[in-house]
Amino acid sequence: MKVREMDIELYRNYSNMLENRSKPGWQYNEIKSCGVKFNSAMRARAYDKCHQRFRDFKKESEEIIAILGLNTDQTVIDIGCGTGAFTIHAAKHLKKVYAVDVSKAMLRLARRKARKAKLDNIEFCHGGFLTYEHRAEPVDAIVSSHVLHHLPDFWKLIGLKRLVQMLKTNGRLYLHDVVFSFDIASYESRINGFIQSMTEKLGLQSPEGLNIHFRQEHSTCNWIMQGFLERAGFVIDKADYKDDFMASYLCTRKGE
């Protein structure tokens, strides 16, 4: 990293520290992300390039919009929007998108994409499951993809309960993340196999980024995730488990 970029990163870290002074001393600091550090400008720039090797962002976005049954009169929160993969596509089809992320570096890239696409119906917000304050009217839907695993389990539940309050009654949540549904007795062989497969699929020189996910981040088991969603105030309409490592949930906020 160049000297100028290092200076900028130090300033951003200091700024984030000041922001979190207003929070209780016991609250989990979601701004200081665990695992791979996406607060880094360098990491943010590399994110799209890496994920495009195994994800079709446009197809994913279209499928999510269809699953949620969204239309041009509706609003959505993209919690953990990253560089705007879903946000930018969704904004072309919806009334408004609230794009939320803990990484200012990611948000900067997302804003650039929005300007390039000439989209003016996106509100970018710095925050996450625990810190984002939604001051507008409740939204029709919330989308969260590859994000919730950054929170420890207790804070996952707190974050999901906060999302419920941002949704209209009968509003919907689409949640996609790393969730373990394999037989725990075979965890070593399953994890080793997954890491080897993804290393080859992504053309990585080293599996360390994947190792970090299992070693430092907070992916959980399917039965735990289902319990969190239900206790938070959601009805699970559909749960889809893929390859024993990925899960998608379509949920509805319970009526009053």
Label each PLM-derived region with a short phrase.
Residues T83-T131:
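Class I SAM-dependent methyltransferase SAM/SAH-binding core
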Residues H146-V147:
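Short catalytic micro-motifs in class I SAM-dependent methyltransferases
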Residues L157-T169:
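A short glycine-rich, Lys/Arg-flanked "PGG" loop and its adjoining helix->strand segment in the class I
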Residues H176-A232, A239:
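C-terminal alpha-helical "lid/dimerization" subdomain adjacent to the S-adenosyl-L-methionine
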Residues A232-F234, K238-E256:
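Core SAM-dependent methyltransferase catalytic element
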